Amino acid sequence: ELPKLERDVFDEEEIGRALEELDKMVGQTGIKKQIRDFVELARHYSHEGVKLSSRMSLQWCLTGNSAMGKGTVARIIARLYKAMGIVDKGQVFDFKVERMIGLMEDEAQRSIGEALVKSSGGILLFDEDSPKLNEAVGFRERVRALLMNQMAEHPGSYIIIYAEPRNRVSGINGDAEHMSDLVNVLVFEDYTKEELMIILKRRLEKERMKMTATARQYMTVFIG
């Protein structure tokens, strides 16, 4: 089972560093607020000596278009969970669901089981964000059912972060109606033109490069 959240187990310095990394992300102000609110609520329950998992979900669903930072946010959540004493390892095991296309059911079950074992003590990022899955009707639902069956055998033993394409939030059990009771949902908004330019500038700076005025003008038109 997940360790019981006790009072004063929070590593506030590490929480601060994780939140600093969160703040460095471009845009996504709503997501930043949701995560900070989660941390504050978790801190409140910790001070009260209340087991966090008895009051709020520890599972997450990240939905949005590709390349919006879902993997980065998953790693930040893992760091926060380790600092809060929720998991032993602040690591994320990335499981690409598209790799299961074409597998027999017993092979798929074995693959999911191995992924859960590898993620034990950390977090499993169950990545369903792939255009290949759109072509396989009902595939996501079948794979999700296999995952749920294995998790049901060891309730409370695993923490899952689901990464889903935009407008496909289905929740931990595939039931959108009850989804908010079972997972914390983070919706990634598309970047604005200004935010895309900031991201481009940062990447160029990492390569010790700069845009010329002509290049900047071209990119402004291209992004627009």
For every predicted segment, state its role.
Residues 15-58, 79:
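Pre-Walker A (pre-P-loop) alpha-helix and adjacent loop at the N terminus of AAA/AAA+ ATPase modules
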Residues 54-90, 117:
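Walker A/P-loop
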Residues 96, 118-139:
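Conserved P-loop NTPase "ATPase switch" module shared by AAA+ and STAND
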Residues 127-129, 160-168, 190-191:
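A short beta-strand-to-loop transition that corresponds to the Sensor-1 phosphate-sensing loop
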Residues 173-190:
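A short helix-turn-beta junction within AAA+ P-loop NTPase domains corresponding to the substrate/partner-engaging
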